[in-house]
Amino acid sequence: MSMTTPIVDFVRSYAQSGTARLHMPGHKGQSLLGFEPLDITEIRGADELYAPEGIIAESEANATRLFGTAHSYYSTEGSSQCIRAMLFLALQGAPQSGKRPVLLAARNAHKALLYAAALLDFDIRWLWPSAQAEGALCSCPVTAEALTGALHALAQQGISPFGVYVTSPDYLGGVQDIPALAAVCRAQGVPLLVDNAHGAYLRFLPLNCHPIAQGAAMCCDSAHKTLPVVTGGAYLHLGHNAPVQDEAAVRGALALFGSTSPSYLILQSLDACNAVLAGDYPRRLAQCCAALEGLRRSLNKAAAVRQCPVPLAVAGTQQEPMKLTLDAAALGCTGTVLAEALRCAQMECEYADPRYVVLMFTPENPPQDYTRLQTALEQLLAAVPAGLPCPENRAGEFAALQQQAVQRCTIRQAVLGAQVRVPVHKALGRVCAMPTVSCPPAIPVAVSGEEITPAAIALMQRYGIEELSVLR
């Protein structure tokens, strides 16, 4: 498929024109780091991100065709901007009841959701992981039955949520059953909103499993996480079932949460990516996923030979194909120890916690990256002692967190209130102010406005959180 790159073409032409730059930015195209000649602002012909009529409009139309959406909008400020805009639009599109707006959301949400709740002043009712789920901060699998039950429970309280919000894929690579959740939302007349920050590439697999294709009303993609796009490049995708379709309203929502000086370096990267996606990238993507599946099988076969208590590589139909998530319990160590061992072998992971290590691959990783990783892990497997115990199921910790959770004030009141930092061990009974998270994965243990409970303190200490902000 042939694909134009109008933003790239315009900026390159301007950079080569010799025009005197009597406008921002202050570097005037003079190279300090090398990219400055291509770094421009919204001059004549460069279009305007939040009111495009020219090259940006053309480029976004290209992205819309590639993703098969009703409309795909660019963001130069990551999925965080898109999440806020998406929630703003869902609020705008919801029937006005005169009551406080409520969002039904899976608990493993990024802190951007809490910031949006503070800014837009809505409440959140949480979907928690089931008692059968493996306990992990990053995971919250939601079944269609659980969602149906939660919606019915809210209806009995006279609450009609303005949206259902899930994160899929999550930080450990787990994916929700989006078609089943979308069917429930469609039957209940509630839009399904998906934080698909880690799944932009899903559209380009042999079997399209992008959230919009599977029935979500809106979703955000961090292009920079899994596609060849520089940091900050993202999309807000609308399906044909999105509650708001008016283009001006969507751009207004993005502008509300975005800078008036969008990066043209990021816009060029998004534009250039269209041509890549229209070329042989899907083929290379399939090859990458196949190589990772082969690596998973090889590692798990080696782990079985060593009689490890669990598979080394997390696998299954509910795992996305382009993350390699390692269960350090297979080696008898913590995820942070395993990450340090890989670091000593000149490999930097995406994320590590007490149990897991997350490694992110794309088609841009050369073959030697796979070889280096496999060699290092096989050496670690060879040193595994016999008779390692099975890891403890930590689901009870999250069940306790759910049972003890009490919301003492709204998220907005907590985030905007007077705050003080205290050690975690002195926070019992205080009210969480700003969410205390590590980044990655930026998922809060205690939510703003919640009382700090014994279960919350235990989890914070397990995940290495030493201080948090509480209301004075």
Question: Which residue ranges define each predicted feature?
Answer:
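N-terminal "arm"/small-domain region of PLP-dependent enzymes with the aminotransferase-like
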Residues: 1-54, 190
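Conserved PLP-enzyme active-site core in the AAT-like
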Residues: 3-12, 78-311
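Short, glycine-/Ser/Thr-/acidic-enriched flexible segments
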Residues: 29, 171, 225-226, 241-243, ...
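Conserved N-terminal alpha-helix of the aminotransferase class I/II PLP-enzyme fold
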Residues: 36-81
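Short active-site oxyanion
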Residues: 70-72, 99-103, 445
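Generic beta-strand/beta-sheet core signal
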Residues: 106, 127, 167, 195, ...
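Conserved C-terminal alpha-helix-loop-beta "cap" of PLP-dependent enzymes
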Residues: 300, 304-448, 454, 459-463
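Terminal helix/beta-alpha structural elements that buttress the NAD(P)+-binding lobe
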Residues: 467
